[in-house]
């Protein structure tokens, strides 16, 4: 009995000693997420283990950052505005699958010579909220397998693939974008992509789509017919430089909250038609360069445009050399302060319909190189500012109403007058082209 009691006491004290002992062993085995650069500097490996001290080469904790110019970037990455011209390979070790990062922003930003990312299936993104700038400038990548990415909690995908011009394809069919609010410049500069299937993208919460497809010159088609843009406020440069697009279906676009549309289609010279008849532009303030260089367009229906809040229209149609006529009779330009070069180099344009004269403080070269333009007066290369934006004394052509059109008959010859009030004899069909007063209304005779 005594021996048994002694045994129990010994076990009791042993247990107490174990419980009170410093947790040195546990501390030594604590895992951490870190990035290690190989001795030759060309490979970055992501680990989540307790072996950091044994790794050769420099290493950084996964949450270590450096700040420059107010911008924080991962400690292992290059300066946010510089380039990493050393790293050719990135590897995610199998141990990393147990780690749950909350951000992958700028992880490989400007890794311009990166050729391969291995083990991406070990990157668990289920808790990631920010993927902005993740692969920005990775121009050396020719393929990218993101099939294991869980994006259900991501809110920011801006600049995510920007500058990845080496990619020829990108499979994002499994991406869950229901919580994403920022997609600006997401694919900008991906000039190697020839197709992009975004048919499953949920964009109901996106507010910014500016530069989203900027300079995606390799795309020849883009189906956005399912896009929900009800909350988008910024569409500037959205398709700018998409010179390969021959058609673009934007019939699903709700633009009621958009305030910026400048450069939206600039450089889309492959487009031959563009249906914007449903566009609501009541809140848009900037439209400069909107159709700049769209030389393939032969017609453009802007009848739905509400321009009452627009302040800038300079270069809006500049370089639209395929247009022969343009109806802007519904344009309200009372708040526009800049119209310079608005129709510059619209070399095939013969008619601009508008029933009102425009005024604007900045309007030099507004009609420069519009040599075919015919309005109330003949085109004069020395008169190309806003003073010629007039249906009575300039290059504008008044648009007759339906009521006026039905009255243009021989029986109404006695009701036709010149703008100076002189009565015109003869039938309407035999009169020379010009602006007349018919039954008390200004009417154009083409």
Model-derived segments and their meaning:
Residues 398-420:
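Residue-level detector of functionally pivotal "anchor" positions at catalytic/ligand-binding pockets or at interdomain
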Residues 9-21:
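Bacterial N-terminal signal peptides
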Residues 53, 424, 443-444:
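Short, isolated positions in well-ordered beta-strands
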Residues 1-7:
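N-terminal secretory signal peptides that target proteins for export/translocation
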Residues 423-430:
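Glycine-centered tight-turn motifs at strand-turn-strand junctions
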Residues 26-400:
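Negatively charged
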Residues 435-446:
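C-terminal tail/sorting-segment detector
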């Amino acid at each position: 009995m005594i021996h048994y009691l002694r045994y129990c006491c010994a076990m009791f004290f042993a247990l107490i000693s174990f419980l009170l002992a410093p947790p040195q062993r546990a501390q030594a085995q604590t895992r951490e997420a870190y990035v290690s650069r190989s001795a030759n500097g060309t490979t970055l490996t992501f680990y989540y283990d307790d072996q950091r001290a044994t790794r050769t080469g420099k290493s950084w904790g996964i949450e270590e950052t450096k700040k420059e110019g107010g911008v924080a970037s991962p400690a292992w990455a290059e300066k946010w505005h510089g380039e990493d011209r050393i790293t050719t390979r990135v590897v995610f070790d199998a141990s990393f699958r147990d780690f749950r990062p909350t951000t992958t922003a700028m992880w490989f930003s400007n890794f311009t010579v990166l050729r391969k990312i291995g083990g991406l299936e070990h990157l668990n993104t289920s808790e990631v909220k920010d993927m902005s700038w993740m692969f920005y400038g990775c121009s050396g990548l020719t393929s990218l397998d993101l099939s294991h990415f869980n994006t259900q909690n991501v809110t920011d995908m801006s600049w995510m693939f920007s500058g990845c011009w080496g990619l020829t394809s990108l499979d994002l069919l499994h991406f869950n974008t229901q919580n994403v609010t920022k997609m600006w410049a997401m694919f900008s500069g991906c000039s190697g992509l020839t197709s992009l299937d975004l048919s499953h993208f949920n964009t109901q919460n996106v507010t910014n789509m500016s530069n989203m497809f900027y300079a995606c010159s390799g795309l020849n088609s883009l189906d956005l017919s399912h896009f929900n843009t009800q909350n988008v406020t910024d569409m500037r440069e959205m398709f700018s430089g998409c010179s390969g697009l021959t058609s673009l279906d934007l019939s699903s676009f709700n633009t009621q909250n958009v305030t910026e549309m400048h450069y939206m289609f600039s450089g889309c010279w492959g487009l031959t038609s563009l249906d914007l008849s449903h566009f609501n532009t009541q809140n848009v303030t900037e439209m400069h360069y909107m159709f700049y260089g769209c030389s393939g367009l032969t017609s453009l229906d802007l009848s739905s445009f509400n321009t009452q809040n627009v302040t800038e229209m300079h270069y809006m149609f500049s370089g639209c050399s395929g247009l022969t006529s343009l109806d802007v009779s519904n344009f309200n330009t009372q708040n526009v302060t800049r119209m310079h070069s608005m129709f510059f180099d619209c070399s095939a344009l013969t008619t601009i319909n508008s029933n009102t004269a425009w005024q604007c403080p900045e309007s030099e070269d507004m009609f420069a190189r519009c040599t075919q333009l015919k309005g109330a007066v003949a085109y004069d290369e020395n008169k190309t500012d806003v003073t010629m934006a007039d249906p009575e004394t300039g290059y504008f052509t008044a648009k007759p109403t339906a009521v006026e059109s039905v009255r243009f008959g021989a029986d109404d010859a006695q009701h036709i007058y010149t703008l100076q009030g002189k009565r015109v004899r003869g039938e309407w069909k035999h009169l020379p082209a010009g602006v007349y007063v018919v039954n008390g209304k200004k009417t154009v005779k083409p």
